[in-house]
Amino acid sequence: MRLIRTLTAGLACAALLPAMAAAQAAPQKLRSFTDSWYWGAKGGVSMFGDVAENINAPTVGGEWMITRTRVAMYVSVEQSFFDTQGAVYDPSSSGSARIVDIKDSRRYNVQLFAFPKQYGSFRPYAGLGFALISIRDAQPEGTFVSPASQDTVLSMVNDASSRTTPVFTLGSQYDFSRSAVFVQASAMPTKNRFLINGKPTTYMIEAGLRYNLTDAIEKMH
């Protein structure tokens, strides 16, 4: 009888081994960084200069990141909130500059991130790509000497309300389970052909949370 009980217990343990192995493997899969699709939310500050002062604008955004082993494709949208002024050339205005009231901006950002090395749960990274920055509302001040002058100024304001620019990012994320917290800083040249041109470079500092939603590539089982 003792032998039968021992054999029965052994068979029961053997039957449980595959389930235990699967349970141990599942968390590892959930924490996998490679070939994953992260969705994220973030907040921070956008720092730039207008014609008279430096601006620190609160910024919120969403992002999507598709990873491989050491690289990732990164797409994000950010909204910055501010009220300030810019200027465009207008020979009919005093000082040949027409003041433009500016409100808020949005950035559409596409980059390639490199994750060169992992330090425990920390993953430092660097990114390079392009961003489209668009001012939400821009209205020239004052009156115009003629309809033609008004049309010219409005056309210049429209042309200077958006700008495509290179963007460079440095950051780090800390992985835990299927999530990751991160902090990053980006820099974009915005001096030329743009209403926000008080400084040669616009900076953005952000922090947020990424969630590993699903596999980016279907795994073979």
Region locations from a protein language model:
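Predominantly the C-terminal beta-signal and adjacent terminal strand-loop region
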Residues: 82-86, 168, 173-221
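Gram-negative (and chloroplast) outer-membrane scaffold detector with strong preference
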Residues: 63-146
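Extracellular loop and loop/strand-boundary signature of outer-membrane beta-barrel proteins
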Residues: 46-50, 93-101, 152-158, 191-197
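Membrane-embedded beta-strand positions of outer-membrane beta-barrel proteins
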Residues: 39-43, 73-77, 110-112, 124-128, ...
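Short glycine/proline- and aromatic-enriched beta-strand/turn motifs that initiate or cap beta-hairpins
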Residues: 22-73, 210, 214-216, 221
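Transmembrane beta-strands of outer-membrane beta-barrel pores
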Residues: 43-49, 68-70, 77-83, 130-136, ...
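Outer-membrane beta-barrel translocator domains and adjoining extracellular loop/strand segments
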Residues: 51-58, 85-92, 136-146, 183, ...
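Residues that define the transmembrane beta-barrel architecture of outer-membrane proteins
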Residues: 35-37, 54-60, 69, 102-108, ...
